Design a protein with these regions (language model features):
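Active-site catalytic microenvironments in core metabolic enzymes, especially phosphate/sugar-handling
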Residues: 363
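A translation/RNA-centric and nucleic-acid-associated enzymatic feature enriched
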Residues: 350, 355-357, 367
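Active-site bordering "gate/hinge" segments
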Residues: 1-352, 372-459
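Active-site/pore-lining binding-face segments in mid-to-C-terminal subdomains
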Residues: 366-368, 372
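Short, acidic, Ser/Thr-enriched surface-loop or helix-capping motifs
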Residues: 360
C-alpha cells in the first residue's frame, strides 16, 4: 500500500451563507455548524463580533459567565464523545458486533460506567441550559458582552452536584488511563505518528480553553512559535485546497505545506501546556506527560486519555468559578468604536477554532473565514487512516476488521463530520482499494445500520 486518503463528501458552505448578514446575527447563525458544540461557535463568533464592535475587553461578569458556558460545553462534549461514542470501542473491543458496539452495549456490560457518562454529560448540558436558556442552540452572547448573568437559584443548582461531578471526572481519567495502558503496545502503535501540535496557552504556559496566545511545538517538543496574538494568525497559518476533498489542509507557514501540518484538540493541548491550573487535572497531566518521556505523546488513541484530563479540569474550574461573586453581576455589556475586522479564537472541545469576519460600514459581513477543529486535524486523520490501513490491509480484500479499525482511528479525533451519524456506534463508511493504475480492486460500504455491501459483487 502506498497511500490512503480520507475523502470528505459533505459540503457545508457556511462561509458563504454568512456573507451579507448583519454582524450581530453571526453568533446565533454559526451555532448551526454543529449540534454537539454549538456554544464553541457561539463564543468564537462572539469574540470576533466583540472586536467588530470595538469591545475586546469585557466586564468581569461577561467574561466569567462566558467562560463558565465554555467549561460546561467542553465538559458535556468530552463526556459525550468518551462515553457515548468511544467507550464502546475501548470497553467492548474494536471487533465487537456493530449492534453491540454502542452506548446500549456499554450499559449492558458496564452499567455503572454508562450511567456515570450520562450524568456527566447531563451536568454540562444543565450549565448551558441555565446560562443560555436551552441545552442546544441557546443564546448568551451579544456584541460586547452577554444577555444575562447567573442567578442565585441557578448557581445553587449547579453547586449542589459539582463535588460529585469532580469525583466522577477523576474516576473517568482513571478509566481512560487504565484502558490505554491495558494494551499499551497496541495503543501506542495504533495510528501513531509524529506531528506538530497547536493550541492556546496562557502567558505562563498554562492550559487555556477560552483565551490566551497561540503556541505551536514540533514532534520533539521544540517551540515553533509562542504567545502569538490570535488576531495575527494569518501570518503563521495558511490553508491549502485539494481537489479531492471539501476539507482544507491548514499548515504552519514557516514549515511549508508538506511539513507544516499539525494536530489540535485534547492531545495537542495537554502536550503543549506547561501546567494545568486546577490541582487534580495537573497531577494527571504530569502522569500523562511522563508517559511520553522526553517527547510529546504521539499516539492517536491517547486523545481519549487527554480528553478525560481536560474534562476533569473543566469540572474543577466550574467548581472554582461557581464561588465567584462576579457571575451574578449587573454590568453585562461594554461598547466601543466599530471596527472593520473581527477575529475570535477559542479552544473548542475538538481543537483550536478560528472565526474571522470583515464587515462594511453598514455592519454587513463582507468576508468570512472559518478554520474549524476538524479541518486542522484533516491531515492527521488522513495519516491515521494510512497507518491503520498499512497495518490491517492485506492488499487484496477489504475486511470488516479493517473497517472497524479505520472507524476507531477516525473517531479518536472526534470529527464533527460524523458526529451526527455514529452516535449509536454506526458510522456510515465507504472504503475502496485502488490498483496503481486506478482500477478498483475492492469496494465495501457500511450503511448507518451496520449492513455491509460490496457493490458489483456477484450474489
Amino acid at each position: 500500500m502506498t497511500q490512503a486518503r480520507l475523502h470528505i463528501v459533505e459540503f457545508r458552505g457556511f462561509e458563504k451563507f454568512i456573507t451579507g448578514r448583519a454582524f450581530w446575527e453571526v453568533p446565533v447563525l454559526v451555532q448551526r455548524l454543529c449540534g454537539i458544540c454549538p456554544i464553541s461557535h457561539h463564543l468564537a463568533a462572539g469574540k470576533a463580533v466583540d472586536m467588530l464592535a470595538g469591545a475586546r475587553v469585557l466586564t468581569p461578569t461577561a467574561d466569567k459567565v462566558r467562560r463558565l458556558a465554555h467549561l460546561g460545553q467542553t465538559l458535556q462534549s468530552h463526556a459525550l464523545h468518551f462515553f457515548h461514542l468511544s467507550s464502546p470501542d475501548l470497553l467492548l473491543g474494536f471487533d465487537a458486533e456493530v449492534g453491540q458496539r454502542n452506548l446500549l452495549g456499554v450499559l449492558a456490560a458496564h452499567p455503572e460506567v454508562a450511567r456515570r457518562g450520562i450524568a456527566l454529560r447531563a451536568y454540562g448540558q444543565e450549565v448551558l441550559r441555565l446560562l443560555t436558556g436551552k441545552r442546544v442552540h441557546g443564546v448568551l452572547v451579544v456584541p460586547g458582552g452577554i444577555n444575562q448573568a447567573l442567578g442565585a437559584a441557578a448557581r445553587a443548582t449547579l453547586q449542589r452536584d459539582i463535588d460529585q461531578i469532580v469525583t466522577w471526572s477523576q474516576d473517568s481519567v482513571t478509566l481512560a488511563r487504565e484502558l490505554y495502558l491495558r494494551d499499551e503496545a497496541r495503543n501506542q502503535a495504533f495510528g501513531s505518528f509524529r506531528s506538530s501540535f497547536l493550541g492556546l496557552t496562557r502567558a505562563d504556559g498554562a492550559l487555556e480553553l477560552y483565551d490566551g496566545g497561540l503556541r505551536a511545538r514540533d514532534a520533539d517538543g521544540a517551540t515553533i512559535f509562542d504567545h502569538v496574538d490570535p488576531v495575527e494568525y494569518t501570518r503563521y497559518l495558511r490553508e491549502e485546497v485539494r481537489s479531492w476533498t471539501y476539507l482544507k489542509f491548514p499548515y504552519i507557514v514557516s514549515r511549508g505545506r508538506d511539513a507544516g501540518w499539525y494536530r489540535v484538540g485534547p492531545l495537542a493541548r495537554v502536550n503543549n501546556a506547561d501546567v494545568i491550573t486546577t490541582p487534580l487535572a495537573e497531577a494527571e497531566r504530569v502522569r500523562f506527560r511522563a508517559h511520553g518521556g522526553t517527547t510529546p505523546v504521539w499516539a492517536s488513541l491517547a486523545y481519549h486519555w487527554a480528553r478525560m484530563i481536560e474534562m476533569l479540569h473543566c469540572a474543577e474550574a466550574i467548581r472554582e468559578l461557581l464561588a465567584d461573586a462576579d457571575l451574578g453581576g449587573s454590568d453585562l455589556v461594554v461598547k466601543g468604536e466599530r471596527q472593520g475586522t473581527g477575529i475570535g479564537v477559542i479552544e473548542a472541545p475538538r481543537g483550536t477554532l478560528f472565526h474571522h469576519y470583515e464587515a462594511d460600514a453598514q455592519g454587513l459581513i463582507t468576508r468570512c473565514n472559518l478554520i474549524v477543529s476538524t479541518t486542522s486535524n484533516n491531515q492527521a486523520m488522513n495519516t491515521a487512516v494510512e497507518r491503520v490501513a498499512a497495518q490491517y490491509f492485506d492488499g487484496r480484500a477489504i475486511t470488516e476488521g479493517l473497517l472497524n479499525h479505520i472507524e476507531v482511528a477516525i473517531r479518536a479525533y472526534d470529527p464533527c463530520l460524523s458526529c451526527a451519524t455514529h452516535a449509536l456506534g454506526q458510522m456510515p463508511l465507504e472504503v475502496s482499494a485502488l490498483a496503481p493504475d486506478g482500477a478498483v480492486v475492492d469496494l465495501v460500504r457500511r450503511a448507518a445500520d451496520g449492513t455491509l455491501t460490496r457493490p458489483g459483487a456477484t450474489p
